[in-house]
Amino acid sequence: MKEKQTLQLSVFVVCFFMLLLAGWYYFSKQKQAVITVVERDYDYVMKNDPIGQNKTAPTDYYTLVLSWSPAFCDNQRKRYGNQLPKSLEYQCGTTQHFGWVIHGLWPQNGKARRVSDHPRFCQGDLPMLDHALIEKYLPESPGANLLQGQWEKHGACAFDQAENYFEKQRELYRTLQLPHYELAKNDLFRWVKKNNPALKDTYLGASRNELFICYDLSFNVMDCPRNSSY
């Protein structure tokens, strides 16, 4: 009996250490993937942006833009084949698997008729953010270039600090229940409204692979304008 207990204890100890080793390996690979992304130049250059700056447009509401990552990555692979740019390796490489991710939180002009009518680059061309700050928000916005660009283009029009902007969009994102599989637009709307009571009677927006949820200036859910130019 004693020998059996000793054997069981030995098996337990071995399994425990194997589990620890597997966990260490997984998180080291995760960290390695993150380091690969942020150890590079991910600055966003305003003069190269095709839409440009609009620092006089008012902010009347916000749009949280969520992207279905598998579809986004499929499009990137069609474009680049096996030669993905470094900026896409974290999101679309083989080490990570994302579903719905944050594209950005956009201050919006309620009277906009085109994308350029919305607030953009309100603080001008900003310096590259610290690596540690970028790493913190990669789980929900899986790209250093994405985070840097969204801060410069959109976040700086409503927030004084990048961290406050990233915290707010992550806070909104984490209140949501989102499907783990792809759905057609109307099915997606039904699923989201059924599983998020706060959105039940709310008009949502969508593009081909993105979902739009709108908020007033106090970050209460509101109907997205039906003819909005995102």
Region locations from a protein language model:
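Betabetaalpha-Me/HNH-type nuclease active-site subdomain
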Residues: K47-E140
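Ser/Thr/Pro/Gly-rich low-complexity linker/stalk segments immediately outside membranes or between
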Residues: S28-Y42
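C-terminal, well-folded lobe of enzymatic/effector domains
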Residues: C15-Y25, D41, L129-Y230
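Alpha-helical structural elements
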Residues: L19, V37-E39, A57, T63, ...
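Amphipathic alpha-helical interaction segments
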Residues: Q32-V34, Q76, F159-D160, R174
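N-terminal Sec-pathway targeting helices
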Residues: K2-V14
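Secretory/periplasmic and organellar redox-cofactor proteins
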Residues: V11-V13, A22-G23, Q32-A33
